Amino acid sequence: MAQFFKAKPNRSKQLSSKLSLNVTQLDHLGAGIAHHQGKIVFINGALPGETVQVQLTEQKKKFSRAKLLKVETASGERVSPLCIHYEKCGGCDLQHLNVESQRAHKAKALQELVAKFAQTTASQVCETLSDSPWHYRRRARLATWFDKKTKHISLGFRASSSSDVVEIQSCVVLAKPLSALIPELAFLLNQLSGKKALGHVELTLADNGIFVVLRVTKALSDKDRQRLAEFGASHSLNMLLQDDDANTESLSGHGQQPFYSFNDSDAELKFSAGNFIQVNASVNQAMVNQAVDWLAPQANERVLDLFCGIGNFSLPLAKSGAEVIGVEGVPAMVEQATVNAKGAALDKVSFYHADLSADLSQQPWLGKVDKMLIDPARAGAYESMLSLKKLKPQALVYVSCNPASLARDSEVILKQGYRLTKIAMVDMFPQTHHLESMALFELGK
């Protein structure tokens, strides 16, 4: 059974009397929308078509927020959450909605945001890229919290919009081998004498094994290190310690870097604890395949890949024979991408470190750009898109993890003579409101 620990007490809020409201739709964050006294009311956990009993928890000039107390009339799309920690853990927020409806809602939200802010619609809305809705995450970061009174360390995920840690026994969206480790890891950590020095725990299921990276704020005793090493060896784990300077030390395992590969390639994309990778392996494979298909790079073309990371898109694009220039803002990832390209024997791809908020058109290594791919963080790539008029690629694939920033950046792209020809929702994170998306822009004629 889940135990709920609070890092600090929350300030109590004045609740309204109980209200019965009719939910009409979902917002793009997955909250139900109802109306009361002329204002929109956002209700987490409520679904369209439902009558729900709520209490108002926050009242602003134009909207209110409410706590769901009871579903009086349930939607036919409502299902029972599979996770026993669902109502407390902040990791998932749509398990109460069947997966088909989740995907339909996300696709609709994406199209509405782009239409609203970019004042356009795609010529073609492509099929949603998706796979299994459960046990899909190959990587997760678990939080820890040490209770000074009980001397117990909790291992789990943060509660929604809170620093509180919800101790969990399993996770239904985490890969099964990783989920099975959680209770044993929690027990192990509580046997250590240096519990107060433990930070987060990063779990990764790579192609070459399971990696457990334990963040520590100070050196552990030899006895604690031995316990960790023995646990790692007995469970065939690659157990590593990481200090505050991001230095890592291997305690057990083969000592190699984790890597993943694509089904149609022998290339190994190696990565380190601090490197970003997509957590959903099968959907990432489909997304990369679609990006290559949309751009259709030719052997005589030059392709620019911005925010290239460790080469997730760059290496598959380079397999076509095109020259690929990958640009990344994190030096360590540029170095890793270069190593990955060399290991794959791809000699027409090169990687550079640059400030991606600056104008790249004058960089001596850039030259002519025929096609372009961009995969920015949640903040988007507003500054990079302003330089399109100088680069003038014939086609641009924009991969986004935030539909709001995609919508904003689309407006900039369209103003520079491009048309939005294709768009697709990418269900990278089932059971949550989060989504990836892909858009193809082509230079107008």
Swiss-Prot record:
A Pfam family recorded for this sequence: tRNA_U5-meth_tr
Active site: C401 (nucleophile)
Enzyme Commission designation: 2.1.1.190
Residues engaged in binding [4Fe-4S] cluster: C83, C89, C92, C171
GO BP annotation list: rRNA base methylation
Keywords: 4Fe-4S, Iron, Iron-sulfur, Metal-binding, Methyltransferase, rRNA processing, S-adenosyl-L-methionine, Transferase
Domain TRAM, residue spans: 12-70
GO molecular function list: 4 iron, 4 sulfur cluster binding; iron ion binding; RNA binding; rRNA (uridine-C5-)-methyltransferase activity
Superkingdom field: Bacteria
The keyword GTP-binding is assigned to this record: no
Residues at which S-adenosyl-L-methionine binds: Q278, F307, N312, E328, D355, D375
Keyword Membrane: no
Enzyme class, first EC level, given as a word: transferase
Family statement drawn from the similarity comment of this UniProt entry: Belongs to the class I-like SAM-binding methyltransferase superfamily. RNA M5U methyltransferase family. RlmD subfamily.
Function according to Swiss-Prot or TrEMBL: Catalyzes the formation of 5-methyl-uridine at position 1939 (m5U1939) in 23S rRNA.
Official protein name in the record: 23S rRNA (uracil(1939)-C(5))-methyltransferase RlmD
Organism: Shewanella piezotolerans (strain WP3 / JCM 13877)
Originating gene: rlmD
